[in-house]
Amino acid sequence: MEIDILSLFPDYFASPLQATILGRAIKQGALSVRSRDIREFGLGKWKQVDDSPYNGEGMLLMAEPVVQAIRSIRRKKSKVIYLSPQGQLLSAKKSRELASCSHLVLLCGHYEGIDERALTAEVDEEISIGDYVLTNGCAAALVLVDALARFIPGVLGNQESAEYDSLENGLLEGPQYTRPRVFEGESVPEVLLCGDHQKIADWRKQVSLERTRERRPDLYLQYFYGNSACLSTQEDLPRIEVVSPKTFSVVLEVQDLRKAKKFYSRMFGKECWDGDKLFLLGKTSLYLQQTKETRGPTTVFIELETDHDFVRFLKRWEMLGGELGEQGTGGFPLRQVFDLDGHIWVVSCVQK
């Protein structure tokens, strides 16, 4: 695999690419990484690459030097990636996908960013390594190279290790142990010494689930959502219990009463209805009111009893034609969803 990195600081990459596993992979020919200076394509006598933006402060990389730099190395099957906090969040899945590319061009951002016209003309995808801003994109480019290199055959001494690392299967990796068998009174778990590979695999899976649930509940719920069995009929699903210590009533304006009632009947159960009034729990109720023009979306907040209810709710909502919105941040099980009329439901799960 070949990777070209475009930045204003090509020497930034020298040490990391000469040492550690990446350096060994490059020496062995499993990976080729080159860094080029965008200033080589600067304008005029002074090789200008930046200028002040029309609508803000600071400086921007100009479109022409960036476009020329990309086109000088781009090939027919190249994929150009811009490292940006606005891009798709880098994941193990995305790293594996990029590792299958024959040639990547990584564009590093500098200053306040890059002229949008250069991105529109040449960039295939934007990728972020996290919800924070760096002084430049060089560190992000190194993170991306390191993450995807692990999936290139020949880079790791033992390719199987990449398959068991944290996040590769959507879960955090469980605890690991080496000699001695007992350290400061704490022993290695007996199951790891039994020699039964199936028991060891089952144990690893269980502790991986427990650790993910404890430390990254967002990943835990995402894992169950993605791996839950395909549901053929809504009648096969048990009722989802809504937690509501307080009494409240909500009126939802809908354009098609029959269609909306069918949607919510399948979501919460036909037995919950009394005319056009839906009882979510106890005295908590939802009224549907048909109108030609709605006054805008209503926001409904509900809390579910268990993680599995949370996952089932999202799966059922999507299957019935509802739209899934943004996932909550900070690892808290929270999701915004939209019904058929655009009303907003903020769904969360009881924290135990």
From Swiss-Prot:
The keyword S-adenosyl-L-methionine appears for this protein: yes
Catalytic activity: guanosine(37) in tRNA + S-adenosyl-L-methionine = N(1)-methylguanosine(37) in tRNA + S-adenosyl-L-homocysteine + H(+)
BP-aspect Gene Ontology terms: tRNA N1-guanine methylation
Signal peptide interval: none
Uppermost EC category: transferase
Molecular functions per Gene Ontology: tRNA (guanine(37)-N1)-methyltransferase activity
Keywords for the protein's UniProt record, in alphabetical order: Cytoplasm, Methyltransferase, S-adenosyl-L-methionine, Transferase, tRNA processing
Coarse class of the protein's main subcellular location: cytoplasm
Binding site for S-adenosyl-L-methionine: G109, I129, G130, D131, Y132, V133, L134
Gene3D superfamilies, A to Z: 2,3-Dihydroxybiphenyl 1,2-Dioxygenase, domain 1, 3.40.1280.10, tRNA(m1g37)methyltransferase, domain 2
A cellular component annotation (GO) from this entry: cytosol
Assembly notes: Homodimer.
Family: Belongs to the RNA methyltransferase TrmD family.
Free-text function comment from the UniProt entry: Specifically methylates guanosine-37 in various tRNAs.
Protein name: tRNA (guanine-N(1)-)-methyltransferase
Species this protein is from: Chlamydia trachomatis serovar A (strain ATCC VR-571B / DSM 19440 / HAR-13)
